[in-house]
């Protein structure tokens, strides 16, 4: 049978929270190739890819740019040993927003920053890839699945809440495939940090919500 609906337990927060807006997510990979040289004997002949990366990164945005847009440098990998001018550095980053215009502007900012660095360090090679990982979506108030979820939440004695999220989930991909998908909270907090935790009582409620929704489908 063709799957028509999906309830995704992947939201940060309590299970009474329903995600109604999620962003489009872009990744970018910047590869910088300088020239290796002995750091103590012949540094003049080297081109430090790490130094170029350090010049490039401040030209890019960082953090929360507005209420629905974020930009982040996630990893920097460069050099092999301390006594060699580093030849290769890779910068991996991302930006997210539900706004197409904002995303287009950020893509241009990344490209412009790279072009500035290319012009400044002409003996180095600076390449980049910018690509979309998943697309944004918006759940309308009359979405039948969201309405059923809200009703089930009320049946558990809770008040349903809707919110925007900067995170992505299976729902982004499912919705691209034509599957009406809604994300609810899974009792997780401080996601993607060393202080991430789950509130057990919320997790139990999430399980009860899942059970109730399955029973409603069977009925």
Regions found by a protein language model. Give the residues of each.
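Midchain, well-structured core segments that form catalytic/ion-binding scaffolds
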Residues: 1-135
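Glycine/charged-rich beta-loop-alpha catalytic/anionic-binding loops adjacent to active sites
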Residues: 31-37, 156-157, 188-191
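Alpha-helix N-cap and loop-to-helix initiation/capping positions
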Residues: 48, 141-144, 198-202
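Active-site-adjacent substrate-binding region
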Residues: 51-66, 134-181
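Generic hydrophobic alpha-helical scaffold/packing signal
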Residues: 74-77, 94, 111, 150-153, ...
């Amino acid at each position: 049978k063709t799957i028509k609906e999906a309830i995704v337990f992947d939201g940060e927060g309590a299970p009474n929270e329903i995600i109604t807006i999620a962003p489009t997510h872009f990744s970018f990979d910047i590869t910088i190739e300088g020239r290796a040289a002995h750091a103590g004997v012949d540094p003049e002949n080297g081109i430090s890819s790490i130094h170029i990366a350090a010049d490039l990164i401040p030209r890019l945005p960082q953090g929360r740019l507005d209420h629905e847009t974020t930009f982040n440098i996630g990893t920097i990998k460069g050099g092999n040993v301390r006594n060699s001018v580093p030849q290769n550095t890779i910068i991996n980053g991302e930006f997210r927003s539900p706004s197409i215009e904002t995303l287009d502007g950020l893509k241009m900012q990344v490209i412009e920053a790279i072009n500035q660095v290319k012009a400044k360090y002409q003996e180095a090679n600076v390449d980049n890839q910018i690509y979309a990982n998943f697309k944004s979506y918006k759940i309308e108030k009359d979405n039948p699945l969201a309405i059923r979820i809200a009703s089930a939440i009320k049946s558990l004695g809770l008040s349903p809440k809707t919110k925007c999220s900067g995170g992505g989930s299976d729902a982004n991909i499912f919705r691209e495939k034509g599957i009406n998908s809604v994300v609810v909270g899974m009792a997780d907090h401080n996601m993607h940090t060393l202080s991430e935790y789950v509130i057990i009582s919320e997790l139990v409620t999430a399980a009860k919500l899942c059970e109730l929704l399955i029973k409603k489908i069977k009925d």
